[in-house]
């Protein structure tokens, strides 16, 4: 007797600047997911936060329509229960998708999901918290200065001095909560700092000013829950001065070298650090960990972790696993299985906690 297909709600779109990137990732997943095991049902979250029903979501995913303001949303929670959806696969990058907010909603309605939980997502999205987590785990990071909007508005001169005393030029100025290099500026002079911070503050009220280094950019994919594994490393050779949003998604002048041309020892170091970074933020399911390898010194620095990395067939995350002998359809299958596994364990712990409370109540 054939086993029942798992019903998977493929969540895509979202409210962030990476809405269109999410559509590309979702399209690739839907096309490649093993049809014998999964029924993939697309659910688009419009730019204003409305959940669109499957028929309208299908039109958006196929490229024949956009989520218009006049489209009516629907009750996702009621639909999940009515259709007996088994698991959600959120592939929404950036704010309100990768930062723990969507994950918290899925926890509340009791729907299993692929990827990191609330805490891992939130820490992985916020570059301040991420850096603090890496530092607490004694992982190598580039020197940085955190700048809040409130501090910047109240005393720009003091903060400028703090930055100039703590870091060497050039600097990279980044919003703390934005993906795909949105709002990032490379600053080559002290006079350029105010404009770069103002630009970053358009995207978030927290900014990271980081020491710029002349480095190779290398990435490692991580997969798993309690026993995560790391892929072979891959290198990005940027077509611009640094690997920014335009280079990633518009001009596409960068190239990927997979596997990266590294010594066996350096490759193993990166894989070990990638797993350590994954654990440091409390991630699960999948993440991509980005590194700098400084030219001249060959020192390795952790740049950041992405808990919902780009997931098209040509994105770095799946390409690294393909080079590690895990094909794209099998990778999707593994991620859904990991989501189900994680949800089962969380439910068992929750049920155990509730039984304990009931036992305590019965004694009073």
Residue ranges and their predicted role:
Residues 2-6, 138, 263-364:
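ATP-dependent carboxylate activation and anion-phosphoryl transfer catalytic cores
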Residues 40, 112-113, 141, 171, ...:
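Hydrophobic beta-strand scaffold residues
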Residues 27-28, 198, 275:
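Solvent-exposed alpha-helix faces
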Residues 2-12, 16-17, 82, 123-216:
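Active-site nucleotide/adenylate-binding loops and adjacent lid/helix of ATP-dependent enzymes
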Residues 185-272, 295-301:
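Phosphate-binding site of ATP-dependent enzymes
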Residues 1-119, 123-125, 129, 148-158, ...:
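ATP-binding N-terminal substructure of ATP-dependent carboxylate-amine bond-forming enzymes
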Residues 104-113, 189, 194, 323-324:
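A glycine- and small-aliphatic-rich helix-loop capping segment at beta-alpha/alpha-beta transitions
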